[in-house]
């Protein structure tokens, strides 16, 4: 029974309760870091780790946090983990860290991270909170990867920086669509994905 609950916590945010597609959270970073698959993957991993470990740590001390300062404590824990992730990125993948710019630091204010801490971790056991954090990170990351895949492929004819569709400028046949390298294109793609998910799962349509 416990395993089934953990499995549901892990898998539900990917399709049934996706943070971006259903809850409409984390949109800003979905627009900013999805021009390339590489940055989208790194951002997805960073958010997943921060959400999982912050939820676990908050759950472990939830009975000792005064209600009046719980948000401050949550933000302090989240901020500490974000700083750690940012420093690791700067140390080992500096170029990617520069591409992600301020958006790693802005994980602190990401509604998904704060939302899971407040709505779930404050009421649940550490293991469940950790799995819930991983699940929501995967759901967020799945949307980022879908958006980044389409934007990079259509916008530049590349995947992970490797040419897949030879552009006219390089002597090929494909005319790259520069619109997909601009942030507004992510809105259209996210909207299309939301439509596709709700066509597949009609129960997600608001009444």
Swiss-Prot record:
Its EC number is 7.2.1.1. Coiled coil: none annotated. It comes from the Bacteria. It catalyses: a ubiquinone + n Na(+)(in) + NADH + H(+) = a ubiquinol + n Na(+)(out) + NAD(+). It is a multi-pass membrane protein. GO terms for molecular function: oxidoreductase activity, acting on NAD(P)H, quinone or similar compound as acceptor. The keyword Ion transport applies. It is found in: Cell inner membrane. PANTHER family: ELECTRON TRANSPORT COMPLEX PROTEIN RNFE, NA(+)-TRANSLOCATING NADH-QUINONE REDUCTASE SUBUNIT D. Composed of six subunits; NqrA, NqrB, NqrC, NqrD, NqrE and NqrF. NQR complex catalyzes the reduction of ubiquinone-1 to ubiquinol by two successive reactions, coupled with the transport of Na(+) ions from the cytoplasm to the periplasm. NqrA to NqrE are probably involved in the second step, the conversion of ubisemiquinone to ubiquinol. This is Na(+)-translocating NADH-quinone reductase subunit D. It comes from Haemophilus ducreyi (strain 35000HP / ATCC 700724).
């Amino acid at each position: 029974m416990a395993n089934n609950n953990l499995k549901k916590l892990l898998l539900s945010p990917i399709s049934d309760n996706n943070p971006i597609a259903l809850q409409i959270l984390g949109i800003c970073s979905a627009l900013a870091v999805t021009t390339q698959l590489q940055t989208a993957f790194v951002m997805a991993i960073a958010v997943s780790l921060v959400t999982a470990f912050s939820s676990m740590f908050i759950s472990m001390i939830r009975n000792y946090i005064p209600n009046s300062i719980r948000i401050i404590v949550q933000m302090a824990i989240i901020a500490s983990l974000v700083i750690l992730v940012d420093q690791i990125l700067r140390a080992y993948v500096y170029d990617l860290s520069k591409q992600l710019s301020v958006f790693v630091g802005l994980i602190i204010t990401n509604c998904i991270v704060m939302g899971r801490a407040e709505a779930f971790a404050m009421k649940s056991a550490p293991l469940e909170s950790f799995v819930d954090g991983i699940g929501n990170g995967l759901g967020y990351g799945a949307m980022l990867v879908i958006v980044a895949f389409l934007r990079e492929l259509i916008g530049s004819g590349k995947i992970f920086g490797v040419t897949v569709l030879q552009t006219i400028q390089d002597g090929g046949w494909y005319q790259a669509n520069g619109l997909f390298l601009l942030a507004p294109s992510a809105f259209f793609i996210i909207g299309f994905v939301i439509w596709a998910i709700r066509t597949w799962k009609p129960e997600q349509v608001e009444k």
